């Protein structure tokens, strides 16, 4: 484990020096081929993901190489469970995709060094085996990329490989095709603040509902993520620093016939120990990124 973390850290440190070297070579040749490299990291008070709280304080480094809409990205989460450093839970995601004219499509391979802490034993080979790997397809449309004044986005994510299965009432296994759909809009505020609003749902039973029914009998709400994020960026040459705060409300499982009472329990739930499906979560963070094009 220590070797893995050390190699990852050294790799990121080594790559972070590359953009400036590449810029010098570019200046000498006078040519620009449109290749972009971005390297950086987020320091977060907790790992929040699509309505779930997946851990405590963490460092989340990333490296992205892009060229004419094609991109290859590596992202990692190096954190601690429940605000302690007794059990590290590293994750490494590799994404390859295409982004142009507001359209996005990519495939992500997610790997959990500590096993499969987020997907659990979901029935890989009828639960006789488990895997630390999952794969996810994503398609999205970001109108703000082509019409800056309308920063509306919609994204669809579906798990296509991994421990993503459930057992029905007849003890038969079925692939869940866990799906998360998110709609977002960004608001520019005074003082160069950016407020991002997101609403995410799961349309059927999935990892996001702990493989329980959603929208059943028109009672159970399948809204996984109502998210507000306030951010301020400071741009410098070849880099930017961002500071932000975020709150997230997970409405999954709320009985629509008793919404007032259920939402009234949100604060009480927030005071309890963190868990994956806690209703209300928050975090703060800082981002530092370097970028260069040559």
Residue ranges of predicted features:
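Residues that define the transmembrane beta-barrel architecture of outer-membrane proteins
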Residues: 33-35, 55-59, 88-92, 99-101, ...
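Short glycine/proline- and aromatic-enriched beta-strand/turn motifs that initiate or cap beta-hairpins
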Residues: 23-82, 294
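Surface-exposed loop and membrane-interface regions of Gram-negative outer-membrane beta-barrel proteins
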Residues: 72-99, 105-131
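Outer-membrane beta-barrel transmembrane domain signature
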Residues: 69, 145-151, 155-278, 285-294
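A short, structured loop/turn motif at beta-sheet edges
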Residues: 97-99, 140, 233-237
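Short, solvent-exposed loop/turn segments at secondary-structure boundaries
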Residues: 50-54, 83-87, 167-171
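Transmembrane beta-barrel strands of outer-membrane/channel proteins
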Residues: 39-45, 65, 74-78, 94, ...
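Cleavable N-terminal export/targeting peptides
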Residues: 1-36, 266, 270-275, 292-294
């Amino acid at each position: 484990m220590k070797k893995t973390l050390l190699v990852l850290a050294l790799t990121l440190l080594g790559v972070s020096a590359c953009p400036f070297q590449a810029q010098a070579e570019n200046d000498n040749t006078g040519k620009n081929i449109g290749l972009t490299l971005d390297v950086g990291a987020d320091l977060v008070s907790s790992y929040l993901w699509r309505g779930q709280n997946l851990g405590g304080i963490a460092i989340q480094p990333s490296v992205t190489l892009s060229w004419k809409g094609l991109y290859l990205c590596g992202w990692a989460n190096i954190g601690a469970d429940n605000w302690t450093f007794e059990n590290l839970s590293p994750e490494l995601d590799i994404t390859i995709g295409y982004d142009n004219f507001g359209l996005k499509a990519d495939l992500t391979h997610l790997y959990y060094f500590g096993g499969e802490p987020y997907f659990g034993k979901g029935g890989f080979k009828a639960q006789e085996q488990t895997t630390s790997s999952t794969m996810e397809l994503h398609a999205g449309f970001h109108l703000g990329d082509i019409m800056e004044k309308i920063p509306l986005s919609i994204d669809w994510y579906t798990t296509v490989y991994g421990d993503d299965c459930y057992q029905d009432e007849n003890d038969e296994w079925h692939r869940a095709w866990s799906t998360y759909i998110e709609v977002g809009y960004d608001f520019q505020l005074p003082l160069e603040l950016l407020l991002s609003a997101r609403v995410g749902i799961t349309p059927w039973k999935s990892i996001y509902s702990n493989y329980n029914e959603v929208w059943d009998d028109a009672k159970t709400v399948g809204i996984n993520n109502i998210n507000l994020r306030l951010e301020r960026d400071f741009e410098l040459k070849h880099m930017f620093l961002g500071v932000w705060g975020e709150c997230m409300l997970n409405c999954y499982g709320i009985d629509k016939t008793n919404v007032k009472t259920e939402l009234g329990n949100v604060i009480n739930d927030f005071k309890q120990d963190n868990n994956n499906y806690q209703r209300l979560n928050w975090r703060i963070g800082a981002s530092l990124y370097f970028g260069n094009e040559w």
